[in-house]
Amino acid sequence: MQPVPAAVRNWLIVVAGMIFFMIVLGALTRLTESGLSMVEWKPVTGWLPPVGEQAWQAELEKYLSSPQGRLVNRGFDIDQFKQIFWLEFLHRLWGRLIGLAVALPLAWFWLSGRLSPWLKPRLVALLVLGGLQGALGWAMVASGLVDRPSVSHYRLAAHLLLAVALYAYTVWLVLELGRQDLRHDDAKTMRKATALIALTFVVMTWGALMAGLRAGASHNTFPTMSGYWMPPGLLELAPWWINLFENGTTVQFVHRWLAAFLVLGVLVLAWRARRPEALAAGAMAVVQLGLGIATILTGVSIALATLHQAGAVLLLTILTVVRHRATASRPRPLSAMVAG
């Protein structure tokens, strides 16, 4: 068989970029509390927004009957409703476009014989997981349509982590189809990068829990938390371990210290590896730390919090490159490689 065309790799680069934008858009949707503005899930027929004043009024009435509409925004008029509706609509629309951007080229490349046996199941997995991500997104929204005007912070974390995992998986496929001569066999760096990638996901988990609990606004000082290194109330819930997930103060405390260990670990990796991609990871870790501190000090500014989430994904991207390049190149059939 012939090598996989460069068009396949370019397609996956576009998909990765679309997922990255989706993660940023999701952050904006959450921070502006727009995610509960659409109270129905229409995966097939939901491509078009309301058309005409009557349709908009009907959509507003549905929203006002939801917990958020009744308890938080009960005085909303059409114009105020549109401000939160459009962001959630764009978020859902972009998800559908990602689905098409994966499914249609996948079918074309498959039927035209341009995909290798090595790549086919991996791309099918990407498509299936993308569909599951859409369903998980609705499950998250549905949790805020029952009796409280907010979504489950557990489902919020799961939704974000799956999106980030899909992005990282796509980036890995791009790297696998790229230049293999950039690789160098460095088992120590590979193991450290693997551990730091895992820690990045853990830090992002507590960041998502922090966002879902709105815990970022509870302590807006740094390096202490309202003047305390160990703020009161860390273990006020019983059993004690539930504080790690449901106590806003504890969740912020854990997120801060996990992030500190992550930044320290990345800086050590950069200092020891001394390679361009490792140094870039170190620089990005410092930037991300600065964004996190600024987000806290500003009481969770929407712009800074969005950049902070984007920064986490960029750090993960660079660490993925570090790990890939530190992994010894494995022999692979010619059909798994990119031509050009």
PLM regions with names:
Residues 1-340:
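Polytopic transmembrane helical bundles with strong interfacial aromatic enrichment
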